[in-house]
UniProtKB/Swiss-Prot annotation:
It comes from the Bacteria. Belongs to the protein kinase superfamily. RfaY/WaaY family. Its EC number is 2.7.1.-. GO terms for molecular function: ATP binding; kinase activity. Keywords: ATP-binding, Kinase, Lipopolysaccharide biosynthesis, Nucleotide-binding, Transferase. Kinase involved in the biosynthesis of the core oligosaccharide region of lipopolysaccharide (LPS). Catalyzes the phosphorylation of the second heptose unit (HepII) of the inner core. It comes from Salmonella typhimurium (strain LT2 / SGSC1412 / ATCC 700720). The keyword ATP-binding applies. It is an enzyme of class 2 (transferase). It catalyses: alpha-D-Glc-(1->3)-[L-alpha-D-Hep-(1->7)]-L-alpha-D-Hep-(1->3)-4-O-PO3(2-)-L-alpha-D-Hep-(1->5)-[alpha-Kdo-(2->4)]-alpha-Kdo-(2->6)-lipid A + ATP = alpha-D-Glc-(1->3)-[L-alpha-D-Hep-(1->7)]-4-O-PO3(2-)-L-alpha-D-Hep-(1->3)-4-O-PO3(2-)-L-alpha-D-Hep-(1->5)-[alpha-Kdo-(2->4)]-alpha-Kdo-(2->6)-lipid A + ADP + H(+). This is Lipopolysaccharide core heptose(II) kinase WaaY.
Length: 232
């Protein structure tokens, strides 16, 4: 169950019995948090590892700076991307699929459905990123494939299953940085194609989503050639 509340000028979504995450968020607002490691620090995005009385967490602050008018109108039609991701993550984990990293708190400064600033508290997973592994074994490849196929069965997609978005925690594969977009057949097909591209995991599912994705790419490349551009 997810609870919505107001804290200062933020609309906050948190899981039931998530008072400790509210406390961590309030510490953030008071600049009372200990940063252990900085993962990203650019104009619109800050991602850090913080140490708290309750353990280590990922803290992400995102304040989009471009295409704000476009984002405003999209938000009126499509709603809030991160709020959808928060609800999807909660649902899938309650269904018993725990490979995806947990999403504990989402705080937003918004006007109507348009969000100017996001603050997120996310599970920190200790382990080895696949990008840091010199070689990926067949056993790990099998676990990667199963994790994505199980994710699809639970109505979510990765959106970008590259090596930086998987962590080997002990003997288990964990998935991070998931997509909150609708799990359409084409998006599921893209995940499977990306698994083959990144890991050599053969895609044996040639469904309507696969063919729509392939034909759409061919059409885009055809139009690019007409315009004198290189194909992608």
């Amino acid at each position: 169950m997810i609870i919505e509340k107001k804290i200062k000028n933020y609309t906050v979504f948190v899981k039931k019995d998530g008072e400790k995450y509210i406390e961590i968020f309030k510490d953030f607002l008071s600049y009372n948090h200990q940063v252990i490691k900085v993962f990203r620090n650019i104009e619109d995005t800050k991602v850090v590892l913080i140490n708290t009385d309750y353990g280590k967490y990922i803290l992400k602050v995102f304040s989009p700076k471009v295409k704000n008018t476009e984002r405003f109108f999209k938000s009126l039609v499509k709603g809030d991307y991160y709020e959808k991701l928060f609800h999807q993550t909660d649902r899938v984990r309650r269904e018993g699929f725990a490979a995806l990293n947990d999403f504990y708190l989402l705080a937003e400064i918004k006007t109507l459905r348009y969000v100017k600033t996001y603050v997120m508290i996310i599970e920190y997973i200790e382990g080895i990123e696949l990008v840091d592994m010199p070689e990926i074994s067949d056993e790990v490849r099998g676990k990667i494939k199963q994790s994505i196929y199980s994710l699809h069965q639970h109505g979510m997609v990765s959106g970008d299953p590259h090596k930086g978005n998987f962590i080997l925690q002990g003997n288990e594969i964990r998935i991070i940085d998931l997509s909150g977009k609708r799990p359409s057949r084409q998006r599921k097909a893209k995940d499977r194609i990306d698994l083959e591209r990144h890991y050599g995991i053969k895609n044996n599912v040639r469904d309507i989503g696969f063919y729509l994705l392939i034909y759409k790419k061919k059409l885009r490349n055809f139009l690019r050639r007409i315009k004198g551009k290189e194909k992608r």
